[in-house]
């Protein structure tokens, strides 16, 4: 596209944003309002007007995919070479390669960046070296605390008394100090160090900061609402000379507080950059009017936000369907049936339909419902339910308790949780079993009797054998759910996850609880094992359905769009998450509401919101209540009904 033809394809507000080239600009871009088009057009305009060469423009994104897309779109508008487009980490790494010696830390520009797994291994090694009790102070949690401190721009020497109030924090500081020493000795950095040391470099060396301020005269930052403290400080320092910074974001879509994102960064932009211009992109090109009205009415209940209202010039579209279901199982059946109907009536292809859940554990009931209806589906951002590590672990415990000859099951669980059974001991057990043509479990029993097991492993293996024998007996006389709960307790598996106290571990516990709900539906444990195997093996061809239905969490769906969206589980305690409310109070509620807003605005044409009147928790049917977010959606844009069509007065609050 030559000259400035691209300007004429923009709406008035988009044009204002593109033509604003001097001074700080906050571009509040609502969902589906064309922010990427504006960003790329703005870069093209700066180059076209000869305000800066491509080498003097810095555009920062959160993902390599977004950076690549931005570069391609800029090049489609104007031919340019040398534009600096990349992620926060890639741009920070580039600066450190050139300037690392000025930090005087002993690092050189051949440093390597270590993976998450290597970071965690180093933390574990230090914890072991320092003889720290891992039951009280889980290495994974220590690593998370260290990463969070780095996201806040805090080196060990900068930690305040308030940062180390708790015993866990004091232990984490001790590990952090040793962790950083090890990194420096090895000439390696982790991802958190890249921006952390960039900022240290800028603070300690004003000449280097000035060099990059001159180099990057125009700065553009995408998804500004997702920046953490260290990213925010980095951008602010770089922009403090010329102040030609354009931050694009939507405070209503700030949903990553749990991983360090600070919505306050976008809310205080005007204070950080005096005289800043704020432009709101509110014309939505994605969704129908009822969908936008629902999103606006929900998010308007948040107090800490920049006010904006999405609108569209598209036709009104379908009303939002809000469906009450008798139970969570009925909810899954209803959604699977409705999707089957939409596809068979050729209204939509399966590939244009999504189910967006608040938490990963919710996917199980939908997976099973789709298998029953032979509808192809895919899980995005995670494994299918029965393929998840913790589910496979528990299944292995069940299998070895039913069939003591199951070598694969035994090998999976023998050191989960850790039982100090090393590779040498395992090889010895395998060799003993092969020589005598018996199972590994039988070999362990014999070796315990004749003293062939080393003292270090003897007690743990003897304890495990006793427990497996006990579970084997219990399965013949007790309900499966009771035995599996006993396995989780007796084995220490549940305790292992609880002691981890991480977001990941909490998600695994939620998945196990969901698995227990599934087990509770079976009187015979063999039927459950067979059922789970069939679910894992199921594969439905997509040919006749126009692709697969997408199942994913609301967090994973950010930035995506679908013709039809189903939002299940809109019940108090599920969504908003009770955990968020308990831990974060009003702040947590506002983030939950932003997650709801993101979910609603993924829909282009049709939106279904469902909730269950009851959920089965083991043997108990627990009453559920509609989410407060449902009450925030006006009646006039909805059709509210029951999946059983027995009544429609449930919503007369």
Curated annotation (Swiss-Prot):
Assigned EC number: 5.6.2.4
Enzyme class: isomerase
UvrD-like helicase C-terminal domain sequence ranges: 289-559
SUPFAM superfamilies in the cross-refs: P-loop containing nucleoside triphosphate hydrolases (SSF52540)
InterPro entries: ATP-dep_DNA_helicase_PcrA, DExx_box_DNA_helicase_dom_sf, DNA_helicase_UvrD-like_C, DNA_helicase_UvrD/REP, P-loop_NTPase, UvrD-like_ATP-bd
GO cellular component, one term: DNA helicase complex
Gene Ontology MF term list: 3'-5' DNA helicase activity; ATP binding; ATP hydrolysis activity; DNA binding
Catalytic activity annotation: Couples ATP hydrolysis with the unwinding of duplex DNA by translocating in the 3'-5' direction; ATP + H2O = ADP + phosphate + H(+)
Domain spans labelled UvrD-like helicase ATP-binding: 8-288
CDD domains reported in the protein's UniProt record: DEXQc_UvrD, SF1_C_UvrD
Binding site for ATP: 32-37, 286
One of the protein's GO biological processes: DNA replication
Keywords: ATP-binding, DNA damage, DNA repair, DNA replication, DNA-binding, Helicase, Hydrolase, Isomerase, Nucleotide-binding
PROSITE patterns: UVRD_HELICASE_ATP_BIND (PS51198), UVRD_HELICASE_CTER (PS51217)
Gene3D superfamilies for this protein: 1.10.10.160, P-loop containing nucleotide triphosphate hydrolases, PCRA, domain 4
Function: Has both ATPase and helicase activities. Unwinds DNA duplexes with 3' to 5' polarity with respect to the bound strand and initiates unwinding most effectively when a single-stranded region is present. Involved in the post-incision events of nucleotide excision repair and methyl-directed mismatch repair.
PANTHER family assigned to the protein according to its UniProt record, in alphabetical order: ATP-DEPENDENT DNA HELICASE SRS2, UVRD / RECB / PCRA DNA HELICASE FAMILY MEMBER
UniProt family annotation: Belongs to the helicase family. UvrD subfamily.
Name of the protein in its database record: Probable DNA helicase II homolog
Biological source species: Rickettsia conorii (strain ATCC VR-613 / Malish 7)
């Amino acid at each position: 596209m030559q000259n400035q033809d691209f300007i004429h394809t923009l709406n008035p507000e988009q044009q204002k944003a593109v033509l604003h080239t001097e001074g700080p600009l906050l571009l509040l871009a609502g969902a589906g309002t064309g922010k990427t088009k504006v960003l790329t057009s703005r870069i093209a305009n700066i180059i076209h007007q000869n305000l800066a060469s491509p080498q003097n423009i810095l555009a920062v994104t959160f993902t390599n995919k977004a950076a690549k897309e931005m570069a391609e779109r800029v090049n489609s508008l104007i031919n340019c070479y040398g534009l600096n487009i990349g992620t926060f980490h890639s741009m920070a790494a580039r600066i450190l390669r050139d300037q690392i010696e000025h930090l005087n830390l002993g690092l050189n520009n051949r440093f390597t960046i270590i993976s998450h797994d290597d970071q965690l291994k180093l933390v574990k090694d230090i914890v072991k070296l320092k003889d720290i009790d891992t039951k009280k102070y889980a290495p994974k949690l220590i690593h998370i605390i260290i990463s969070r401190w780095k996201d806040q721009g805090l080196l060990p020497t900068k930690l305040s008394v308030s940062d180390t109030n708790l015993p866990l924090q004091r232990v984490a500081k001790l590990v952090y100090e040793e962790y950083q020493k090890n990194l420096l000795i090895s000439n390696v950095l982790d991802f958190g160090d890249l921006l952390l040391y960039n900022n240290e470099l800028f603070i300690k060396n004003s000449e280097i900061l000035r060099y990059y301020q001159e180099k990057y005269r125009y700065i553009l930052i995408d998804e500004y609402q997702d920046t953490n403290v260290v990213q925010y400080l980095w951008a602010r320092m770089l922009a403090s000379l010329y102040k030609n910074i354009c931050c694009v974001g939507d405070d209503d879509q700030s949903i990553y507080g749990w991983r360090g994102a600070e919505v306050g960064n976008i809310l205080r932009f005007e204070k950080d950059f005096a005289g800043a211009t704020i432009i709101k992109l509110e014309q939505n090109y994605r969704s129908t009017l009822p969908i936008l009205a629902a999103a606006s009415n929900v998010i308007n209940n948040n107090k800490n936000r920049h006010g904006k209202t999405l609108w569209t010039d598209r036709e009104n579209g379908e009303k939002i369907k809000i469906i009450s279901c008798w139970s969570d199982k009925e909810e899954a059946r209803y959604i699977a049936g409705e999707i089957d109907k939409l596809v068979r009536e050729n209204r939509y292809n399966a590939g244009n339909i999504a189910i967006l859940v608040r938490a990963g554990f919710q996917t199980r009931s939908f997976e099973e419902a789709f298998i029953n209806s032979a509808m192809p589906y895919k899980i995005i951002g995670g494994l299918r339910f029965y393929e998840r590590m913790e589910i496979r672990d528990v299944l292995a415990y069940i299998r070895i308790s039913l069939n003591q000859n199951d070598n694969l099951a035994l090998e999976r669980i023998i050191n989960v949780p850790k039982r100090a059974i090393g590779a040498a001991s395992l090889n010895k057990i395998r060799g003993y079993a092969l020589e005598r043509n018996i199972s590994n479990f039988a070999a362990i029993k014999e070796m315990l009797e004749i003293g062939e097991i080393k003292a270090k492993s003897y007690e743990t293996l003897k304890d495990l054998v006793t427990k497996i024998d006990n579970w084997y007996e219990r399965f013949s006389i007790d309900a499966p759910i009771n035995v599996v709960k006993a396995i989780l307790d007796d084995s220490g598996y549940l305790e292992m996850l609880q002691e981890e106290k991480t977001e990941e571990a909490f998600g695994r516990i939620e998945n196990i609880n969901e698995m227990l709900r599934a087990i509770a539906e079976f009187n015979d444990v063999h039927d459950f094992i067979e059922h789970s195997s069939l679910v894992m093996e199921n594969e439905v061809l997509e040919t006749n359905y126009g692709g697969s239905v997408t199942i994913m969490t609301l967090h994973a769906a950010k930035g995506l769009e679908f013709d039809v969206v189903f939002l299940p589980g809109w019940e108090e305690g599920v969504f908003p998450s009770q955990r968020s409310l308990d831990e974060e109070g009003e702040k947590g509620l506002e983030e939950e509401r932003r997650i709801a807003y993101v979910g609603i605005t993924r829909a282009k044409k049709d939106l279904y919101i469902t909730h269950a009147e009851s959920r089965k928790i083991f043997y108990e049917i627990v009453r559920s209540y509609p989410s407060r977010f449902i009450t925030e959606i006006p009646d006039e844009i909805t059709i509210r009904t029951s999946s059983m069509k027995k009544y429609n007065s449930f919503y007369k609050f």
